[in-house]
Amino acid sequence: MFNRNYRTPLKLRHSNFGFRWQPMTPSRGRLRHNKPSASRKLSYDRVEREMRTNSIVEVQHGSHMSLEKNTDVSSFVQYPARGINGDGRCRDYIKLLKLDVSGVINIKSSNGDQDMEPGDKLSGLFILTVLLDKKPYLPEGVNKLPSFAELFGPYSAAYANMHLLDSQKPRFKVLGTIKKFVNCTPGTLYGPLKLNMPLSRRKCPLWTTFKDPDQGNCGGNYKNISKNAIVLSYAFISMHSLIVEPYFQFELKYVG
């Protein structure tokens, strides 16, 4: 408790005007404040910045994606990585805004044209399905995403309105579908395909979260996503010996 009767100790000091009693408390002007030394330690911590709107573009094509008749391939949309220099995303989560899909398919006969008559037709159905994987998961030692049959059942399901199997509905949601019916003479056919999908709305935003276990493992691949990955299902159905070579570009707009 403060004591009102307490007085600062005095000391008799000599000056040009004689002896005077002065308080023993040192003057503030005489105090010297030592500046802290600057840290010379190098820091490689992540640069934290404000979240901003950005986009990432990915192209999927190649021999590993070629489809023969009645086959399918599963893939995913790459998300931005989190870098120490501030590029890409700056948090372990992003807001998905929009996904633009564009590309072509190259269709050709797998057994050549020598067995085909000039008036013969080659027919088939190409399907690209974009799905939201709410809870991304791959068992230990498994690197293959769910196939068309595991998601929708037999290939014949593609001829009508496609619906997920009941066992997959809690985890997956269909965001959009591209269907291209092929009916061509022997040779090569290019079909331009486009799909634009808004992912977030004002009252219904869509967020994705990442595991980011350490600074060296903060990528945008499927295994590092803990919530809301985008899975792609390519499939081709035909009664003829055809090969489909897809070439698609995915442009993802996000806030992160």
Swiss-Prot record:
Residues 150-187 are annotated as: Interaction with Arabidopsis thaliana NSI protein. A motif (Nuclear localization signal) lies at residues 81-96. GO terms for molecular function: single-stranded DNA binding; structural molecule activity. Keywords: DNA-binding, Host cell membrane, Host cytoplasm, Host membrane, Host nucleus, Host-virus interaction, Membrane, Transport, Viral movement protein. This is Nuclear shuttle protein. Binds to the genomic viral ssDNA, shuttles it into and out of the cell nucleus. Begomoviruses use 2 proteins to transport their DNA from cell to cell. The nuclear shuttle protein (NSP) shuttles it between nucleus and cytoplasm and the movement protein (MP) probably transports the DNA-NSP complex to the cell periphery and facilitates movement across the cell wall. It is found in: Host nucleus; Host cytoplasm; Host cell membrane. InterPro entries: Gemini_BR1, GV_A/BR1_coat. A motif (Bipartite nuclear localization signal) lies at residues 18-39. Belongs to the begomovirus nuclear shuttle protein family. Binds to single-stranded and double-stranded viral DNA. Interacts with the host nuclear shuttle interacting (NSI) protein. This interaction may allow NSP to recruit NSI monomers to the viral genome and thus regulate nuclear export of viral genome by NSP. GO terms for biological process: DNA transport; transport of virus in host, cell to cell. Residues 23-44 are annotated as: Disordered.
